[in-house]
């Protein structure tokens, strides 16, 4: 599930709530899922919008989101060499199992350089916007491995190479790493 505006998110939450039991059961059973951008916020217990109105998430996890009036926009470079772009106005509190343990550059769930995202079983969630998998070969491999493992197969030893995607990742990662080091 991908990102959307905060305004559209409330409508999506109402519709998504109809599937909460199905999504929770699939997650418990090990189905691989990816949530990017504001879609991640819907996995928690609740979202409080900038006007102070609260609406429920699906409750896959107990974290909560509080949206503010200040937008957080910028590049992200994870300690585990994940790259991406973030455009959000929410702080996510109480994530017990983050996808990324820390950031060298950018804003995490609650604070700058803090842990970012959510990971439970085969549910991968990040407030990074797409193309998350194309930009992050290691994350793509983790998601593909989760899909294959659930089906009882292994990723093939020899996989196709995508030199342009790999070069794009390497250039982006190197530039963001240099920017993060310059800020220290």
State what each model feature region is.
Residues 13-16, 47-51, 73-74, 141-142:
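Short, glycine/charged-enriched secondary-structure capping and boundary segments
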Residues 123-184:
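Acyltransferase
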Residues 98, 114-126, 138:
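Long, Lys/Arg- and hydrophobic-enriched amphipathic alpha-helices
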Residues 1-35, 44-48:
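Flexible gly/pro-rich beta->alpha loop and the following alpha-helix that scaffold active-site loops
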């Amino acid at each position: 599930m991908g990102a959307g505006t905060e305004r559209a998110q409330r409508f999506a939450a109402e519709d998504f709530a109809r599937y909460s039991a199905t999504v929770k059961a699939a997650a418990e059973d090990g189905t691989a899922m990816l949530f990017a951008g504001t879609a991640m916020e819907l996995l928690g217990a609740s979202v409080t919008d900038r006007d102070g109105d609260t609406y429920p998430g699906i409750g896959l996890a107990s974290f909560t989101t509080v949206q503010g009036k200040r937008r957080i926009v910028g590049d992200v470079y994870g300690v585990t060499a994940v790259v991406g772009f973030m455009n959000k106005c929410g702080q996510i509190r109480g994530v017990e199992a983050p996808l990324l343990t820390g950031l060298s550059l950018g804003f995490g769930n609650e604070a700058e350089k803090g842990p970012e995202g959510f990971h439970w079983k085969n549910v991968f969630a990040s407030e990074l916007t797409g193309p998350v998998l194309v930009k992050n070969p290691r994350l793509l491999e983790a998601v593909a491995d989760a899909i294959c493992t659930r089906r009882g197969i292994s990723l093939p030893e020899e996989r196709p190479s995508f030199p342009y995607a790999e070069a794009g990742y390497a250039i982006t990662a190197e530039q963001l790493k240099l920017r993060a080091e310059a800020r220290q």
